[in-house]
Design a protein with these regions (language model features):
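The first (N-terminal) embedded transmembrane alpha-helix
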Residues: 9-28
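Hydrophobic alpha-helical transmembrane segments in multi-pass integral membrane proteins
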Residues: 148-169
Length: 208
């Protein structure tokens, strides 16, 4: 079991380009023409997997950047480890996002509208980091600017301008999107940063 998990920790991200392309082709062929709103919900999945391809594979380096940048670590591999990254990404990006698409298919797109807000918020964080950390590239920035943010904003505009969601559902979707993004930030800054300080490899501790 440990060998299997260790293999997954090392290689899970390598399937992202194939998964993104395969999923995009399927939803383009079988969903787009039948239900465009549902298509936009499903499209958040391959868009985000493409985003992760940039973060972790080509050019990659997101763990190193995030640890030594936002988390203030002196180490590229801690406090956010490969295992930690796996358990953050898999439940949210590979379970919750597709599940929202499935639920939207059977029970209505209200169930998946939150993904557009989440995608926009998460991608916007890369733009914020670009300005905070010396206007330098961070892994995931290109996909965020060219794919995730435009797609997220367009999806929100399309749903609102066509009256596809009620005010209540819109507010609920905003809240869920914020909570999803905030949960990752809380884990990073309320748990991982204190951990790095406690274990002595945070920059503030290192300088002392």
């Amino acid at each position: 079991m440990n060998k299997t998990l260790n293999w997954l920790y090392e290689h899970w991200m390598k399937g992202t380009p194939f998964l993104a392309l395969y999923t995009f082709v399927l939803i383009w062929l079988y969903v787009r023409g039948n239900d465009y709103a549902l298509y936009l919900i499903w499209l958040q999945c391959p868009a985000y997997w493409f985003h992760e391809f940039e973060e972790y594979v080509c050019p990659g380096g997101f763990l190193s950047f995030f640890n030594q940048g936002p988390l203030g670590s002196t180490r590229p591999d801690k406090p956010l480890t490969k295992a930690g990254s796996f358990w953050i990404n898999i439940p949210l990006m590979y379970v919750l996002l597709p599940l929202s698409g499935v639920l939207s298919n059977y029970f209505g797109t209200d169930w998946g509208f939150w993904t557009a807000y989440y995608s926009t918020l998460n991608a916007s964080a890369h733009v914020v980091m670009f300005f905070i950390f010396g206007r330098k590239y961070n892994p995931g920035l290109v996909a965020s600017v060219l794919v995730n943010i435009p797609l997220g904003i367009y999806t929100i505009w399309y749903f609102l301008s066509n009256g596809l969601v009620s005010t209540e559902v819109n507010i609920q979707s905003i809240i869920v999107g914020i909570v999803a993004q905030a949960s990752m930030m809380v884990y990073g800054f309320a748990y991982l940063v204190p951990t790095s300080k406690k274990e002595g490899y945070h920059k503030s501790v290192y300088k002392v």
